[in-house]
């Protein structure tokens, strides 16, 4: 057996397309344009109105563009293929295929040169840059308003000076016609461009850049130099930006189609070309006739405008319109936007052999099957049918086979069965938000018109059966079928790529059936039951149950099947377990390795069981279990017949008590407000909080009352549905049977009066009216936000599309440090969850036993992650894509597990696209969620206290505190934190505490687990005095810096600081009681309320003023999505915070130009930084505070770019990661960190050059980090001076447009700008990413198309075996590895 080096495609008889490795774009010279052309178009006519034949020399001329009929010249002298290539002597048309009319171009010779609008008007204007003129001046010249001095001669005129009509006449009169040359229009510009020596200009610019200090000038010179270098490198002359010859695109790309009634529909381009030709011909005639200059100039300007309109209509002046005032579509419009060439025809093609239909549920299907209507299959598999009919000898020609199929001969159906057996189809549901929206299934032919799908894949497709439609595609080639079977088959996609959790989890009826089956017995029944029968095995229980001797939820004793053996769920210590017949039946479908599951199994638990099942027994058995689970769930739900009635919505008895208590508390707050103890804002916040707590309390109580079901001897169906996760959620139940709660105004504010009623009791007219607000806004929001979410997904895709696994291990020892995430005192993300599936950087040792848990470079699986957590590790350093050092793409070790397959990521896996899908998909889903809750305010109530999570010793670290009368401590400093230590001094937990918090336990004392040891006022930010003394006011002047406010309701007067223009700075000074010198002073921000009077005596820790916290707004994803977009776009948030640039001590620098000057001095180095902060911003640090680099000095969100500048890359990465995760976490969406890390990596891949050294970079140029390091390495090796650069943070839109690939950038946004830039610089597209390869018609360089798998050696196998296998329709196993004979398949497929 000899091995031949053949590629898979050659073996299967595919023709190799002409391959190319890169694509270059540059500006065409007039000679090039003429070389493309087959002839000049002189006649503006299109076709003859009588004969409907193309006019000679016109826009559809057959002599230029080729014949309209195959193998036939225009006059009909030569017909048929035998005259191929003959040029007719009568009509001059070449005898050839009419298809050439799609590729042959013509040209128009312009009477005068014309500027190309892209190079003139696309900002920054390339013509303006190279000529060093402003775009405005250039326009005046090009549109024939001013003269441009091309050659000043001996006159005092300057080169490139603009002269108005009058100035030109005066100059002529003064110096004479021969003395100087000044011209108008594009001709003048062309003459100047012709004089430019690019190399000399480049040298001059470089010298000028080195010689200047001005940043402004340097920036401008760098831009010009970049353009000049680009032109030199691409061997382009600048005068080619001025057109002398205009190409005419092939006629079949701008067709003229006859409609009925003798009218014609034409492409707008024909109208635009006709205008150009008409004006050009008229100008030629006028030039020969010695016409007055004014007329000629006007005609030249009109020609310039006609060409502008053809190239980019609407960019200059008003757009040229056609019938009905519609702007005509120019060449640029055909490229850009959703309907342009890139997005419509190159990236989104219509697919042959596809169909779509409504979907219905197919409960009888197996997971790898789908039901395909016979009518659809007949059309989709037609070519296969024809081949099979001929093979079987039923027909001999294709035509008769087609007729047979059309007639639907009974024989056809049998053949159809044979053809479709084992031939997979792909099912897709729009919107295709992630890769699980297209999966492969084996078609089962069914009657009827609807496609049937398996209930368990609905979650992945997000499909329901209220009229959803799905598309079917047939993979045709052998490779496509193979990939469908080995990679896309539904049983292979059990896990979600975004979180690694099972996605084929049961929903709705299946969940309900299983949950009902595994319910514990009712308490009443248990009391009635006399004895618990004992059974020896499951079979006995099932017999007894089937014979009616047992009820499903009777309590029974069963001999423990897991006694003495370790299983996942079983209890190996008990000999007998207490269970119910229902649970015994439920356990029959799971493999015995899992053990006996003896708890109620709701949606969440079922997901857990599926995951454990996969980990224990592998995929094949799990898939069988899933199908059994589906059968069981449906059967039991049907038998149980669970349905809800109005009596099942039990309003809890405690509701009235809770509400009256809330009303009392509200009255107390109102009284406090009326007595002036609190402000209106505080009153509002307190009332909202009271009702939020009351609503939460009622929610808890409802659940209890539903579970008890008023003591009836049956399960409450509403409780079963919600508790199992089958239907509805807690909020909906609360609204049905509890309290509707607080509602939001359309502005997002919460209305402080809640809706007390629920739907069971019915709403009053007023309550109903209030609730319409939120419900309507929800619907409007959903419609608007879906588009935003889709756009975010698209931007993410574009930025991450070319991130692929390119190597196994890049060998770096860098990584990131991760730890568990806490919110308040609750652990919300465990350490084990964050490190699972990642590669460890450092050795981790169990401190108790000294055993090595994980070695460097080892993958942390679930078991290891648990062990690390149990070993008490707080922080773990793991490999991350953020620190990956692979040339392009990322390496498998830095990425870790592929969550969808639970295996290490493989070469060629497109992790970037998966990251984009994982982040974008929940965004789209979450916008739909508002729609279901119906406008009730979801308000997160935060406890204003900290509880200890462990027993330990409290330690104050860098905290400044003041002791109060009752032995508590008030926190005065912003920096520092509280720690809880174990007896050996190891830190167990740490908490940041806000200024004004009261610590209830002194430093060094013990705290018990669960004990509250810090409290604070949730409604105000206090300003506290650190020293005791006498109060004195400074710059607190009524009517200027403060106002006295009389509250109408409370009749109380309060002093409020107001915004003011004067150079005054309200401060409260504290004077020493004896010496009367100033010992402390506090700036009071606008909006604060002063609580002391001059001359008052205060003690340390007393509150002297307070600023109310902001009003409460609702939190939902609509607030979240814009936040995610803001983070990924790296926008500067409004009202952003100021952050400290160095470590040091805060000093007050007084007030300068209406801003507060803060100095931070580092006592070690003596360096200091100053910050100028607007007076309206509230400072959260005080004089003498110790601050760390990057710490906030004022309130507000932080600017990401500043974190990068001050703290460096790692802090920024951590900040972005945590901020994005927080938004998703709030919605209960799980996304693995690695996906967000990939996007952040792409945002940080550029470096800004500060000093180019001896490299070829330019000042302030943004270059790829790897390119930067590579170039530096080369220069350093030669002993030169390397470049210096700083990392920059780009928003995802900017990062997408800044890729190496101009094709990908052009297909994303700003098409004309991208192409203009690419053409002037002569860019080369290396075709590395996905989009550019799809556009060029190549396989994408990822997955099976990855370069490693492209050229695989095939081993020839003896033909008989191969054929034998082929006959049997089962070449490949059931979703597992393919048969052994074809050795090449596993490599190609995986």
Swiss-Prot record:
EC class of the enzyme, as a word: transferase
GO molecular function terms attached to this record: DNA binding; DNA-directed RNA polymerase activity; magnesium ion binding; zinc ion binding
Catalytic activities: RNA(n) + a ribonucleoside 5'-triphosphate = RNA(n+1) + diphosphate
CDD domains: RNAP_beta'_C (cd02655), RNAP_beta'_N (cd01609)
Residues holding Zn(2+) 1: 73, 75, 88, 91
Region (Disordered): 1365-1390
Residues engaged in binding Zn(2+) 2: 810, 884, 891, 894
Stored Gene3D superfamilies: 1.10.132.30, 1.10.150.390, 1.10.1790.20, 1.10.40.90, 2.40.40.20, 2.40.50.100, RNA polymerase II, clamp domain, RNA polymerase Rpb1, domain 3
Annotated binding of Mg(2+), by residue: 464, 466, 468
Superkingdom field: Bacteria
An annotated GO cellular component: DNA-directed RNA polymerase complex
One record GO biological process: DNA-templated transcription
InterPro entries: DNA-dir_RpoC_beta_prime, DNA-dir_RpoC_beta_prime_bact, RNA_pol_asu, RNA_pol_N, RNA_pol_Rpb1_1, RNA_pol_Rpb1_3, RNA_pol_Rpb1_3_sf, RNA_pol_Rpb1_4
Record text on cofactor binding: Binds 1 Mg(2+) ion per subunit.
Pfam families found in the cross-reference section: RNA_pol_Rpb1_1, RNA_pol_Rpb1_2, RNA_pol_Rpb1_3, RNA_pol_Rpb1_4, RNA_pol_Rpb1_5
Cofactor(s) in the UniProt record: Mg(2+); Zn(2+)
Oligomer status and interactors: The RNAP catalytic core consists of 2 alpha, 1 beta, 1 beta' and 1 omega subunit. When a sigma factor is associated with the core the holoenzyme is formed, which can initiate transcription.
Function comment: DNA-dependent RNA polymerase catalyzes the transcription of DNA into RNA using the four ribonucleoside triphosphates as substrates.
Family membership noted in the UniProt record: Belongs to the RNA polymerase beta' chain family.
Name assigned to this protein: DNA-directed RNA polymerase subunit beta'
Gene: rpoC
